[in-house]
Amino acid sequence: MFNYISQVITKSYVLAEMEARKLMHDPTELISRAVQPILWLGIFGEALSKVRAIPTQGFTYLQFITPGILTQSVVFVAIFYGLYIIMDRDTGILQKLLVTPTPRIALVWGKMISAGLRGLTMAVVVVIFALILGVKLNISILSILGIILIVMLGAAVFTGLSMIIASIVKTRERFMGIGQVITLPLFFASNAIYPISIMPGWMQVVANINPLSYMVNGLRVLMLTNTTTGIGFDLLVLVVTALVMSVISAWMYPKVVI
């Protein structure tokens, strides 16, 4: 048992490192993705901050949506990780990985960790741009560590979802279509840019079962307050969801090549 756990951790690290090397050799994707949160904060956030029609729990609107835009950036990176699996299959890399003794869960965790690292780079972009806009954030060692943890867990959740989708649809075209369809509904059916309390009843139900909402909750507490009140439940939801996604993804992973 100990040897198995050790192998899973080691292989996950190796696979994550491989993905990180790809990012270092071709950072253009992250650069292009960094434009989106900058536009959301700089245009959408600035415009709605003048309206003052949305209750923001005592914060400015820019403060309120900064954790939401950070979450959006991480989710948009993670949700397309299934596409990389399909690309690996098309190039023959996936088939080679599947015939090795590498545990399936390690293949999944390697992708999840890689997505988390990409998500952290997006988090840095969002925080820096928010500070440039004059947004007051709680920057401390505790908050930074908490943000890293939540970003990694959130990336794991949505990478797992992405891998499950890839295992079902199996083609790039279908995956891109479904990816585009689910990302914006996930974002808007959460508390990222407005509180759940002002949503219609049915939408509140969706928001309360949407993992993205718990990611935003945790980040909002860490980034805007000096407390950690309620963050334990948010972390619990993310951890449990990430584990469930890991197990399902590991089980479905080989189906990509069938």
Which stretches of residues belong to each language-model region?
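Pore- or pathway-lining transmembrane helices of multi-pass membrane proteins that form conduits
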Residues: I31-P37, T171-S190
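Short alpha-helical transmembrane interface motifs in multi-pass membrane proteins
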Residues: F2, H25-T28, Q63, V74-I79, ...
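Alpha-helical transmembrane segments and their short interhelical loops
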Residues: R104, V108-G179, N226-A250
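Aromatic- and glycine-rich beta-strand/loop motifs that create alpha-glucan
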Residues: M1-Q36
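Hydrophobic alpha-helical transmembrane segments of multi-pass membrane transport proteins
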Residues: L39-F44, Y61-L133, L153-G154, F158, ...
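Short, hydrophobic transmembrane alpha-helix segments
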Residues: P27, A47-Q57
